[in-house]
Design a protein with these regions (language model features):
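Bacterial N-terminal signal peptides
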Residues: 11-22
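Bacterial N-terminal signal peptides that target proteins for export
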Residues: 2-12
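Glycan-processing catalytic domains of CAZymes
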Residues: 27-209
Length: 209
C-alpha cells in the first residue's frame, strides 16, 4: 500500500477475522478471510457530512476490501448523534458492508486514559445511557479495550474499603458489565450481542478490573 495515501483521517483499526490461510487479494473480495475495521467516535461523528464520508471512504475502499465496520458511538464523552449513526449505517449497507457498534468508555483518553468511576452514581447513569443508545442502533456492539477503571476518587476509596484494588475492581467491573451494559442493552434490543474485548496489553491490567 502506498504509504503516502492519507488514511489516518479515519484512524482505522483493522481486524483480520478468521485464520489467514491465503493472502492473495481478489478483485471483489478475499478468499480465505474477512476484514473488519473499527472507527473511533471522532471519525464517526464526522460522518454527519456525507461528502466527507464519501470521499474518505473512496480512499480506503480503493486499498482494502471491507466486509464489516464497527461504528463507535462514544469516546471521551463524545456521543455520536442518532441521525449521524443512521446515515452512516445506510451508507455502508448500500455498499454491502455489515455494520456493528462500538463503545470506548473513557472520560479523557489523553489524560492518562481517564476512565469512568463505576461507583459514582452520575458516571453509572452515563455508562448505562451509552449502552442503551448503542443498542438502539445496532444488533451487535463491541466494548473497546478501555472497559476498565483506574479511578481512585473518594467514592471509589470508600467503596473499596479493606479490599485490594484488584479484588474491588474485578467485582466492580463484573457488576458494571452485567448491570450497566448487558442488561440495559438487552432491554432496549433483546437481539443485541455484546462483545467485551478485555484489555490484554499487560498482566497488570487485572488490577484495573
Amino acid at each position: 500500500m502506498n504509504s503516502k495515501i492519507k488514511v489516518d483521517k479515519f484512524v482505522i483499526v483493522v481486524f483480520l477475522l478468521c485464520m489467514v490461510c491465503n493472502m492473495t487479494m481478489q478483485a471483489k473480495a478475499y478468499e480465505s478471510f474477512k476484514v473488519s475495521i473499527y472507527v473511533r467516535a471522532y471519525e464517526v461523528d464526522k460522518m454527519k457530512d456525507i461528502h466527507w464520508l464519501d470521499s474518505t471512504w473512496n480512499v480506503i475502499s480503493q486499498q482494502l476490501e471491507v466486509d464489516k465496520i464497527y461504528l463507535e458511538t462514544h469516546r471521551d464523552l463524545l456521543v455520536v448523534e442518532d441521525a449521524t449513526l443512521e446515515q452512516a449505517k445506510k451508507f455502508f449497507h448500500d455498499r454491502g458492508i455489515e455494520t456493528a457498534g462500538g463503545i470506548t468508555y473513557t472520560i479523557n483518553e489523553a489524560n492518562s486514559f481517564e476512565t469512568f468511576c463505576y461507583s459514582n452514581p452520575e458516571h453509572r447513569k452515563m455508562v448505562q445511557k451509552i449502552a442503551e443508545h448503542t443498542a438502539k442502533h445496532f444488533d451487535e456492539f463491541i466494548l473497546d479495550d478501555f472497559f476498565f477503571t483506574s479511578c481512585k476518587s473518594d467514592i471509589e476509596i470508600k467503596a473499596k474499603g479493606m479490599q485490594s484494588w484488584t479484588d474491588y475492581r474485578l467485582k466492580l467491573m463484573t457488576e458494571a458489565g452485567r448491570d450497566l451494559v448487558l442488561k440495559p442493552a438487552k432491554k432496549v434490543n433483546p437481539q443485541v450481542k455484546v462483545i467485551i474485548k478485555y484489555p490484554n496489553w499487560y498482566e497488570s491490567y487485572r488490577q484495573c478490573g
